[in-house]
Amino acid sequence: MLYFENDYCEGAHPAILQKLTETNFEKVSGYGTDPYCASAREKIRAACACPEADVQFISGGTQSNVIVIASMLQRWQGVVAAATGHVAGHEAGAIEYTGHKVITLPQHNGKLDAAELRALVATFYADDNHDHMVFPGMVYISHPTEYGTLYTKAELEALHAVCQEYKMPLFLDGARLGYGLAAEGTDVTLADLARLTDVFYIGGTKVGALCGEAVVFPHGAPAHFMTMVKQQGALLAKGRLLGIQFDVLFTDGLYFSISKNAIATANRLKAGFAAKGYRFFMDSPTNQIFLVLENTQLAALEGKAKFGFWEKFDDTHTVVRIATSWATRMDEVEALIDLM
């Protein structure tokens, strides 16, 4: 069986496992106050060119989204997201569970449009009844998006400008951030994210770690953020588990080098599929490939290759997601191309 269902099929990079083993019997303080977390924070600040940033480690992506959003919104506010945003469709109502509405806008290749965002907020405040409505209090985007697409620096600057104008924090979900930064042709860097967002996170779960995300607040975390992490059940007593992993990932550029493997293998797959005449549902420059397959083709591949179901295209076709990762081998890629 060839596994291309997602980018978290594998465990962790061997260097992380080695460091976890080497440090296993060291006695350190808990809850993220250990020296490994401190070292990882400094390395992340340096990578972001943001020495004053507050860096917090959280166990997973949905936990990060819920806690960040809940910590930065007032009770009468909601968060604006693309209709295809992860918080809008694939987190089981986790944001709504905290009492905050997800206010959706149309997606454009998975992205929010700054002009539409400005129009939404301007229309809200122009309504004489807006005190009876959920206030747009924050903006959520992801990079890469659910479709593997990327924002340009200009697009981020435009969103940033709207958020500044209306005093709304801009939050960037970076569950797959490594793959976005490694993509060919991107003009967005970690330093840009530190400059243009109020909070973003660096995904580890999908980029080489066993688990964990590094949440970066360029201008400081909200008051009592750690307490909210604890309250939501996402504060690990053995915080070293996350600190060690990110310390390794941000040593000698490992996070960025392993991300490039996902891009290289995805590009080879795309070239192979294109040569065979396959239809692409979306042009993604990152590690996620979306193909439109005939249902009969999909049935024939069952038991031979594992893909992620995305959506029904029509009565006879299905959109599937094929994902590469930091660990995908080129021989697996060639085997899939041959199989297809």
Can you describe what each PLM-predicted range is?
Residues 13-61, 83-88, 94:
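Conserved N-terminal alpha-helix of the aminotransferase class I/II PLP-enzyme fold
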Residues 71-89, 118:
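Conserved PLP-anchoring active-site segment centered on the Schiff-base-forming lysine
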Residues 74-76, 267-268, 272-340:
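Conserved C-terminal alpha-helix-loop-beta "cap" of PLP-dependent enzymes
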Residues 99-144, 151-158:
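PLP-dependent aminotransferase-class I/II
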Residues 102-103, 170-172, 280, 307:
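Hydrophobic beta-strand scaffold residues
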Residues 108, 135-136, 142, 150, ...:
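Active-site C-terminal subdomain of aminotransferase-like
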Residues 151-183:
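Catalytic PLP-binding core of fold-type I/II PLP enzymes
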